[in-house]
Amino acid sequence: MLNDSVPAHVLVRSRRIYSTSPDGAMLGAIAIRGDSIVAVARESNSLDSLITPTTCVIDDPTLTWLPAFYDTHNHLLEATRNATFVPVNRARTVAELVSLIREQAARTPAGRWIQTSNAWHERKLAEGRLPTAQELDLATRDHPVILRRGGHMAVLNSRGLEASGITAATPDPPGGRLGRLADGTLDGMLEGGAQYALVHVPPLPIEEQIAGVEQSCRMFTASGIGTVRDPVVSPEGMRLYQAAAEAGRLSLRVRPMLLMFPSGSVAARIAQIEGFAMRSGFGNEWLKVWGLKFVMDGGPEGGALDEPYVTDASFRGHLNWDPEEMFAVMTAAVQRGWRVGTHAIGDRAVRTVLDIYERIIMANPRLPAGMFVIEHAFLADTTERARAIRMGVHITVQHALLHALGASLLRLWGPDRTRPIMPVKAWLDEGADLSAGSDYPIGFYEPVRTIWGMVTRQTETVGIQGPEYAIDRETALRLTTVAGARLSGEPNCLGPLAPGRFADLVAFRADPITCEIDRLPELKPVMTIVGGRAAFDPEAMFASKAAMSVGKL
């Protein structure tokens, strides 16, 4: 396919360029002008007529090129904690974790909050548990401390509890739980939505926040990611993204989801939606609002199950939202043009969310396609999968969660409910619309590791879980690239390497599709191009002639 009326700013030649187009074409050349692909060809020299004296030609037959990855569930703003806050992932004991916080306290003015990164898990500690408020007090009593783990667990020290107004008399908030010792004393643990409902940490200065976003973007583009869908963004987070975009410091595309809390009246939550003064699709090619995020249940410790937890016969997890209230708020959202994505991992949560979606669709039969998504859907049997497929509900899956949380899931849910978690092959065989991501910072973020994980179903510490749900590499590649374009409603500008699409592509020295499977998770890109410019180029293969300015809202 050739458009010889326009010269190329960049020409890529290689023997192996995976287009991921429906016909599975392998390309030999791609011509880029500005931020878009203008021509592709199967022969490497077929586009040479588009070369001018200023064209940047990247001619390396040993490289394998793919579309840049689209991580459809990546907490980019949360990832900035890893660059900014206490790196507790280095600790291997509770004492080491406390020591890291103590070191930060020595450099921090008294009274100022100390926060930790959340890309870690207590399974890495010798004690295999979260520390208590009393243990965090050993680090400092002069600073409020919040120790975050992933998006669903946190621990405060005593000063943090005091600063947040949390006492032994404080009731559990909707969708959350306060941890207590046997005598009723608070142990500092905040499960589920408790940290979001009860703790309000002052933000860092805006320049520090923008620098953190910029550093996270560089980390992700170095792994080949060109677009992320950030599933938990507050209005303040949205303003941060806008500031970063306006400053030209987004090196990848972001599709934010504004988070809806389960607290407050239905009328107040509908008023909140109306107050956003935007809706799905607002923005430009670099920063565009995807929709709203609802959270129906928790993580492995709080996912809403039909049957009791292995560790507690009286506990089946909890639903964060009253179903009738979610129905009312969600109906108002979709009627105002908002897409909705809902976190649901337990079978009871998945079924309840599908019940709500079905009621909304029946009451609003003219809604456009692509309005409803379930994030994760850990447990979905044949009946619920069929319902989701019939309603056109998109499912986002993240093998990194099974990889990182396998041991916890086995302990809490048991083997019969761990093996079929995120049954990707079953979903696809039955006709579901799926896309893949990482849910970083809970698990790994590298897309090649996501592909490896979906092919092997391997976990970090408890072996292979559910091998019957594994898929092949080319299918996994599509789930980590072009599937995201469908989810975003942008199939004409993102996705396959084809004329008219954005020039978002990534190069590897080895072929991720054909290399030995054990080598796959260790592969590193040598270049990532986003919007026709080098977002990652450690070997300086890309000439600055083709550089473009970042679009602004």
Q: Which residues fall in each region the model found?
A:
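Residue-level recognition of conserved beta-strand edge/terminus positions
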Residues: S117, R148, Q398, V506-R509, ...
